[in-house]
Regions:
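Short secondary-structure boundary segments
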Residues: 66-69, 178, 200, 236, ...
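N-terminal leader/targeting and accessory segments in enzymes
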Residues: 1-90, 94, 231, 239, ...
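Acidic, Mg2+-coordinating active-site environments of NTP-dependent enzymes
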Residues: 7, 11, 70-75, 184, ...
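Short acidic/polar active-site loop segments enriched in Thr and Asp
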Residues: 62-63, 172, 194, 399
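Short internal beta-strands
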Residues: 62-68, 232-236, 375-376, 400-407
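Phosphate-binding loop of NTP-binding sites
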Residues: 7-12, 87-236, 240-248, 281, ...
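ATP-dependent carboxylate-amine ligase
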Residues: 1-14, 32-38, 51, 249, ...
């Protein structure tokens, strides 16, 4: 069906007499508008798209959508809507013919565990013979389609374009991370989620949401705004999971590591060698064998098992998929050093994730007398209140700490570092303005059985500084160090 302005805005309340204008593309970036395109003006935190309406029209926009009254002396139609972000979502879904209506889509949200749960579920679905793509922090993981990492959840236009490409390439299943920003900004408003998953919630992104309550409300949308979903899987070991379970508007499956609920990890052994045990789901028992480590990963395995079961995946495929899902990029990735020490890279960047990762390493260390060296930092232009908290958490577990930049963005590195230092009670740390130097110092210090853990960046291959992406990789530095020695 030919894309027209009337078709793209179908179903948006309050709009009447929409002209049948052909539309050849959609963009929220006026500089990218080509003749025949629809321009949708978005008022963002840094830029107001309404100021660029004249540029969009000069570039040939066939129509413009805005939330404001706009005086236009030209013939270009200006359509006023109550919410431009919702309009982008609807227009993008219509333009690309609602690809998620034709696929099975799982949406996963939570402060921590989204990527690991998504990777586990993707592995399970592939073991069951389902052509599955994964969308999230790691980018788009799909055979034959390579997309760079960007936002955890892409903007609405990019998202529906990617989903359309995946559908046309024969993909039947999509596993998608849904960030709080995406939910708050209506980026996934017109995604047809068949199943949803809640991993956990802890204070994070308060620089954006303002309060933990608003952050929670954004996450809750995934469980209250999609009434056509088949089921929701909820980790009720987290206090916010219990609240969501009570609010959810679709059938729920509760998971727990500690209580006998819908799906539970009845007996488990978590060691440096992996996670083993039995997950009980009604009359079915799943034998779990995973090389992943940590209680937090056992929770992720539980969520992935639960949603797989409700999707109708067979027992063998679930067990095989979990067993085959080994190291997840940037999540507890380990590297052996020539000194006999071990380096670990993890994406952890919240207080809760720090606690879980560091406590797991401390608990599972072979040599209790060995040293733990932690290389870390905090992001600039983000929630400042957590910086001293994260410093205090690191001090609790580390023999020595190396405070370094981690995407300082437009803040001074020295200011961020000082706010981290405020959480320390002792002077068992060194401070660096260059992360590479800090990481190499830690690697040189480590001897047999010691652990060097670099937190925050995971598989990121850049430092975000002063509106630029500067090439940088913890993993490359560790690999180069190993080869040099």
């Amino acid at each position: 069906m030919k894309n027209t302005l009337k078709k793209l805005l179908k179903g948006i309340n309050g709009i009447k007499n929409i002209p049948e204008i052909p539309i050849s593309g959609i963009s929220t970036n006026s500089a990218l508008i080509k003749p025949g395109n629809l321009y949708i003006a978005i008022k963002g935190n840094r830029y107001d798209g309404n100021k660029f309406i004249p540029e969009a029209i000069n570039n040939g926009a066939s129509a413009v959508i805005t939330e404001y009254d706009y005086s236009n002396k030209l013939s270009t139609p200006i359509i006023k809507v109550t919410n431009s972000r919702k309009a982008v979502s609807r227009a993008a879904a219509e333009y690309y013919d609602h690809p998620t209506k034709k696929m099975s889509v799982v949406g996963i949200t939570g402060t921590n565990g989204k990527t690991s749960t998504a990777s586990l579920l993707t592995s399970i679905l592939k073991s069951a013979g389902k052509k599955t793509a994964q969308i999230g922090t790691l980018g788009i993981i799909a055979q034959g389609l390579s997309k760079e990492k960007g936002l955890t959840t892409p903007d609405s236009i990019t998202l529906h374009q990617n989903l359309s490409e995946l559908y046309n390439d024969g993909y039947t299943h999509i596993v998608m991370e849904a960030s709080s920003h995406a939910l708050d900004q209506y980026r996934v408003n017109d995604i047809d989620f068949n199943y949803t998953v809640f991993t956990n919630l802890y204070p994070e992104h308060l620089d954006y949401h303002g309060t933990i309550e608003k952050y929670f409300e954004a996450k809750t949308k995934l469980f209250t705004s999609y009434p056509n979903s088949t089921a929701a899987v909820i980790n009720i070991d987290n206090e916010y999971g219990k609240i969501i379970s009570n609010r959810c508007t679709v059938p729920i499956i509760n998971t727990s590591m500690i209580s006998n609920t819908d799906i539970s990890f009845l007996d488990n052994k978590i060691s440096i060698d992996g996670i083993y045990g039995t997950i009980k789901a009604g009359k079915i028992s799943y034998n779990i064998k995973s090389s992943m480590i940590g209680t937090f990963n056992a929770e992720n395995i539980l969520c992935a098992t639960a949603v797989s079961k409700v999707m109708g995946i067979n027992k063998k495929a679930i067990e095989d998929g979990i067993s085959l899902c080994n190291t997840i990029p940037g999540r507890m990735e380990t590297f052996s050093l020539y000194s006999g020490a071990t380096a670990i890279v993890d994406y952890a960047h919240t207080p809760d994730a720090y606690t879980k990762v560091l406590s797991t390493i401390k608990e599972l260390m072979i040599d209790s007398e060995a040293n733990i060296y932690v290389v870390f930092g905090c992001g600039g232009n983000r929630d400042k209140s957590k910086r001293s908290i994260m410093g205090a958490i690191v001090e609790q577990f580390a023999t020595h700490s190396f405070i370094t930049p981690d995407n300082p963005r437009n803040e001074k590195i020295s200011v961020i570092n000082q706010e981290i230092i405020n959480g320390f009670k002792k002077n068992n740390f060194d401070v660096f303005l260059d992360r590479e130097k800090g990481l190499k110092t830690a690697l040189n210090k480590a001897v047999k059985n010691d652990i060097v853990i670099a937190l925050g960046k995971g598989r990121e291959d850049y430092q975000e500084m002063n509106d630029e992406l500067i090439p940088y990789s913890d993993i490359n530095i560790i690999n180069e160090y190993s080869h040099e020695n």
